[in-house]
A protein has these predicted regions:
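Short, Gly/Pro- and small/polar-rich lid/capping loops
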Residues: 1-48
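An anion-binding catalytic pocket shared by soluble metabolic enzymes
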Residues: 20-33, 39, 142-218
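Non-catalytic accessory segments adjacent to catalytic cores
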Residues: 32-34, 40-143, 147, 230-232
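A residue-level signal for conserved active-site and pocket-lining positions in enzyme catalytic cores
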Residues: 62, 128, 184, 286, ...
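Contiguous alpha-helical scaffold segments within structured protein domains
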Residues: 82-112, 118-119, 142, 194-291
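Secondary-structure boundary elements
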Residues: 115, 123-131, 157-160, 169-172, ...
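A glycine-rich phosphate-binding loop feature that marks nucleotide/adenosyl-phosphate handling sites
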Residues: 169-173, 239-247, 304-308
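Glycine-rich, small/acidic residue-mixed loop/short-helix segments
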Residues: 283-284, 289-308
Length: 308
């Protein structure tokens, strides 16, 4: 228990130091794990990567926007530390540091505007112009009295099976989230992704409805086709219910043998993202509708991120 408390304290202080001293940093908790991880670098070491470029054999942390070409793709070329290994002295941490200010002017949609956008997409689906589109909405709130670190740990406690993350890119902003969807995971033997779709209250006893099963099958078929179009044969696992806080989703694991994908990680990621779970289907048509209907830029919301 003492070790866990120490790691939480150290990581909270490190997050505060990143914000106060305005240097790039990230923190995360892997799905189903208890430990926390951290990494940081000097601003001039933060790498901006061109589209299609991916550091396959370099340790660090990757942070990409929802739509390629719209915003920079960042890579933190650092050794990832466990939270209990953090040195606050090395981060020039001082308690009560003043946070660096970043002025953000979001464009919020009223509920009426959002409802109109939903109806526009539903009409397009009714005309069979697209099969699925995922709409997002921005809501600006007063900053909570809790710190970034406190919010990060609350998310980790609430969503134990999610990838929980916090990222600070000076001049760009801070991003915090908890996602149940793994875009790509490599264990040295296989590459694994998941088809995640269909939502209901967690713990429901009745069988999944036809609508949710069809929605999930769209994602499974999409990912399988992406792999086969690249000449890769997917291994499709058994469908199961995956809990995410107060809800659960249908999930099908899909994997590849690592050898068949050597040197093609950037190509595979680019083809997979955005999946129907965050964008829609067919991919390009759904993206066109999202650009047309939404009144804001998603920026890094719905993008992908994670350790290398």
């Amino acid at each position: 228990m003492a070790k866990e408390v120490d790691s939480i304290h150290l990581l909270s202080c490190a997050i505060e130091a990143s914000l106060g001293n305005d240097f790039p940093a990230f923190a995360f908790r892997l799905p189903g794990e208890d430990g926390f991880y951290w990494g940081a670098c000097e601003p001039d070491r933060l790498m901006t990567l061109a589209d299609g470029v991916f550091p396959e054999r370099q340790e660090g942390f990757f942070f990409a926007p929802f739509e390629e070409g719209e915003l920079p793709r960042y890579f933190f070329p650092v050794k990832i530390q466990r939270a209990e290994e953090i040195s606050l002295e090395a981060l020039n941490y001082e308690a009560g540091q003043t946070l660096a200010n970043l002025e953000i002017k979001p464009v919020d949609s009223s509920f009426e505007q959002y409802e109109k956008q939903v109806n526009t997409l539903v009409a397009a689906m009714s005309r069979k112009e697209i099969k699925k589109a995922v709409l997002s909405r921005t809501v600006t709130l007063n900053r909570p009295v809790v710190s970034d670190g406190q919010l990060f740990f609350r998310l980790a406690a609430k969503y134990d099976s999610a990838f929980v993350s916090w990222v600070n890119v000076p001049g760009v902003g801070q991003w915090i989230g908890a996602t149940p969807e793994t875009l790509l995971d490599c264990d040295g033997v296989s590459l694994t992704t998941m088809a995640l779709a269909g939502t209901r209250k967690a713990g429901a006893k009745e069988p999944w409805g036809q609508k949710e099963q069809e929605e999930q099958q769209i994602v499974t078929d999409y990912i399988s086709k992406v792999f086969r179009d690249k000449g890769l044969e997917p291994i499709i696992g058994e469908r199961f219910s995956r809990k995410a806080g107060q809800v659960e989703h249908l999930c099908t694991p899909i994997s590849l043998k690592v050898g068949s994908a050597n040197g093609r990680l950037a190509e595979i990621l680019s083809a997979l993202h955005p999946t129907p779970a965050v964008g829609g289907y067919p991919k390009e048509l759904a993206m066109e509708w999202i650009r047309r209907v939404e009144s804001h830029e998603r920026r890094y919301y719905g993008g992908y991120l994670g350790p290398m």
